[in-house]
């Protein structure tokens, strides 16, 4: 089981990298919006399928607002676990005594922020519409990636951090709900190419799988110590 989990992480990493390269290189055509600054039409990879789906899924302000505001709720999980960590620090007065899964979460959040910043600089393609009088980086869908990473990590970490079963169940239901609503509404909003959503799912799946490996290792160590 342990070996299979690590292999799955590697497979997902390779899939995310290969897919990103393919998006940047395969079937790249100028089907995106015109750059207001240069007057040049932006190019997009997998243009045939992206163009087909974009024509079916025009911009929908309702789904856009849903993905935007429900996405904000995901940061409630970050605040929740940060609060638990702070409470543990106040009680135990020793950083080393804080639950190691909380530390793993903190490091994971930093990694997510780094990946987010990386793709803001490394522009693979631009959004299918101009929303702020300028082209915006579109790959991967940051809302998709953040929702899956934040909510998915909560699902994995809650069993080690939240001892109250009822609260844990509520957290997990909320995590699944927010994650699904954001991903689906982001696709239906029409503010991303189809491959942006897929890329976001692949990248975040690798990150969540790897985080899960870390959590399982911590849990095993804690069980052995007890």
Describe every region a protein language model picked out.
Residues 2, 6, 62-65, 98, ...:
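Hydrophobic, aromatic-rich alpha-helical transmembrane segments
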Residues 2-77, 120-131:
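N-terminal transmembrane-helix/juxtamembrane module of multi-pass inner/ER membrane proteins
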Residues 4-7, 128-226:
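Membrane-embedded catalytic cores of phosphoryl/pyrophosphoryl-handling enzymes
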Residues 12, 70-77, 109, 113, ...:
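Hydrophobic alpha-helical transmembrane segments of polytopic
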Residues 14, 18, 103-118, 149, ...:
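Hydrophobic, lipid-facing residues on alpha-helical transmembrane segments of integral membrane proteins
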Residues 17-21, 112-115, 177-187:
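Aromatic-anchored segments of alpha-helical transmembrane domains
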Residues 28-39, 83-171:
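Membrane-interface loops
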Residues 57-59, 63-66, 79-95:
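Membrane-helix interface/capping segments
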């Amino acid at each position: 089981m342990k070996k299979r989990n690590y292999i799955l992480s590697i497979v997902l990493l390779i899939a995310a990298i290969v897919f990103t390269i393919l998006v940047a290189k395969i079937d790249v055509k100028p089907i995106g919006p015109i750059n207001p600054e240069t007057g040049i039409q932006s190019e997009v990879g997998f243009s045939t399928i992206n163009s087909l789906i974009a024509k079916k899924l025009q911009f929908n302000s309702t789904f856009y607002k849903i993905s935007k505001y429900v996405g904000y709720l995901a940061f409630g999980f970050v605040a929740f676990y940060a609060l638990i960590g702070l409470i543990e620090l106040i009680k135990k007065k020793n950083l080393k005594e804080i639950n190691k899964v909380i530390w793993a979460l903190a490091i994971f959040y930093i990694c997510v922020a780094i990946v987010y910043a990386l793709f803001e600089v490394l522009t693979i393609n631009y959004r299918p519409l101009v929303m702020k009088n300028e082209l915006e980086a579109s790959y991967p869908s940051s809302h998709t990636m953040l929702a899956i990473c934040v909510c998915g990590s909560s699902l994995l970490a809650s069993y080690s951090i939240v001892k109250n079963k009822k609260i844990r169940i509520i957290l997990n239901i909320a995590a699944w709900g927010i994650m699904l609503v954001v991903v689906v509404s982001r696709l239906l909003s029409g503010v991303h190419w189809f491959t942006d959503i897929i890329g976001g799912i692949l990248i975040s799946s690798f990150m969540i799988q790897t985080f899960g490996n870390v959590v399982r290792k911590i849990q095993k160590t804690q069980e052995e110590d007890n």
